[in-house]
Amino acid sequence: MIKIRELSAGDIEPLAAFFSTQTGMSRPSLRSRLEWLARNPASILDIPFGVAAYQSDQLCGAMIYVPMRFSNGTAVRTCVLSILFYVDASVRGAGVPMFLAYRRLAKQYPLFAATANQSSARLWSSFGAHAIAGSEFEYVKVCHALPILAEFILRRFSRSQNPQPPDTQPPPSTQRSDQKLVPITDPEAALKTIAPSEPGSYGLLRDPQMVRWKIYERGRTLHGYRTERSDCLCLFQCSRRGTRFQIAAVDIIEVWGHLDPQDSSNFIACIQRLFSADLIGFRGASPLTKSDALTRHFRRRKFPCPAVWLMDPNALLENRFEYSALAGE
């Protein structure tokens, strides 16, 4: 018989062990990630750390909850992100009661997913959630064709299509210096330049606690891009894509401030130089898509299904949810 119960930060050790069996990642790296999640400044007592399924006192499924604060410039709402949703192959039926436990939070908090696959997307859809427009694709720009061509050949002729990802994603290469795009290593200096949310849609609340935890405690760094026309803060995520992790990819996670349309080409060139990128991209649901000057340098790459889903049955966000890639874990 499957038993469902709520999780707390005290369950980190068994959770790390379970997720290790499901993902192939090491316990220490997962433990570190879970400990970081437990330090979430948006956490509140009403929202547990997650939910788990047990069979004969054996952990066989789990989902982690990540509260995130969103603001429309005047009001603040807590939304709950679902991540690390895994169920052991021997008890696939445990996924539904776990999701139902999570869904009960929707009475008070909007719920969302940021990296849904086809299976979880069907689950979200069946329980009344809707996909966020644009999340079914990403924008990509190929900077170096050879690693992309190698991936095409590998996918076409290689027998193994699903290698396990490494525990940590190394940066594509040693970063180079760039006079216009520079790292801001001091969190306090970065916090002074972040503007508050403007009235309008509910976007991720950019308060000091969130920026410090979500970016700097995670080992990331904001970059400043400044020219005669532009002055903005940027967040990038470096990763290795491809069957053999041969593609040095840079995702543009956030751009805060003013990026002048005339600087779009230079901005992309600075990213390519700084990170020696083979591929640059950003999510289709990102506010960056509003810049025609930026998107014309990119092509759309379609996903198998929408990646971002929202469940807000009581319209707490007034149908004005603005997705941010930084809101996804």
Please report, for each region that a protein language model flagged, where it lies by residue.
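Short, histidine-centered active-site or binding-site loop motifs used for metal coordination
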Residues: 19, 84-86, 256
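Amide-forming acyltransferase catalytic core, primarily the GNAT-like/NAT-type
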Residues: 7, 11-64, 69-72, 127-253
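Active-site/acyl-donor-binding loops of N-acyltransferases
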Residues: 67, 110-170, 216-217, 235-329
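Conserved acetyl-CoA-binding loop-helix of GNAT-fold acetyltransferases
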Residues: 87-105, 261-273
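Long, hydrophobic/aromatic-enriched structural stretches that serve as scaffold segments
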Residues: 60-98
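Short glycine/proline-enriched coil/turn segments at helix->beta-strand junctions
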Residues: 56, 106-109, 229-231, 275-278
